[in-house]
């Protein structure tokens, strides 16, 4: 797979995550939804947003490098997603959903590594990992309880 496949693979992953959340919450979610953040407010496009604007999700379809090392630049992009999510009000449930990808070299998934390394930056953001082949979402940090979310 070449880097030119990344945008399509990322978009496919995003759509699968949206479908999973729609089934989980029995609600409609929008892709690439703009929400005003900051002061003065400026629109930012979040990957997936609940129609009632109570859930915002950023999707990260990252993998370990071929040699099992950390994709450092991609972790910076995940931190940027956390930064934007942090500007949303407390009424939002905020999620970073990462592709389930595991390496024996470190005996952990990339989402587990991300949370372990950057939890001081994550705050009230839920970190989940999704296995699209088996349609399984796993919580790394947070609670994906459906009561009163949206």
What are these regions (language model features)?
Residues 26-28, 91, 124:
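A generic structural signal for alpha->beta connector loops
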Residues 95-150:
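Domain-level recognition of nuclease-like catalytic cores that cleave nucleotide substrates
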Residues 44-60:
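Active-site beta-strand-loop-beta-strand hairpin of nuclease catalytic cores
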Residues 1-36:
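Acidic-basic catalytic patches of nuclease active cores, encompassing PD-(D/E)XK
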Residues 42-44, 80:
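Alpha-helical scaffolding within the catalytic cores
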Residues 18-29, 43, 69-70, 112-118:
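Catalytic phosphate/metal-binding cores of nucleic-acid and nucleotide-processing enzymes, i.e., regions
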Residues 36-41, 103-106:
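Acidic-and-aromatic substrate-binding clefts and catalytic sites of carbohydrate-active enzymes
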Residues 60-117:
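Catalytic cores of nucleic-acid endonucleases
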């Amino acid at each position: 797979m070449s880097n030119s496949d990344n945008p399509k693979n990322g978009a496919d992953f995003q759509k699968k995550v949206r479908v999973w959340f729609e089934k989980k919450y029995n609600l409609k979610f929008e892709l690439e939804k703009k929400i005003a953040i900051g002061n003065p407010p400026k629109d930012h496009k979040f990957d997936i947003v609940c129609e009632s604007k109570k859930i915002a999700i950023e999707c990260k379809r990252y993998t370990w490098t071929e040699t099992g090392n950390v994709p450092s630049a991609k972790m910076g992009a995940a931190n940027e997603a956390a930064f934007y999510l942090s500007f949303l009000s407390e009424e939002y449930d905020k999620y970073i959903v990462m592709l389930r990808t595991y390496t024996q070299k470190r005996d952990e998934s990339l989402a587990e590594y991300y949370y372990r390394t950057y939890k001081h930056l994550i705050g009230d953001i839920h970190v989940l990992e999704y296995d699209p082949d088996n349609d399984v979402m796993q919580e790394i940090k947070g609670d994906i309880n459906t009561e009163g979310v949206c």
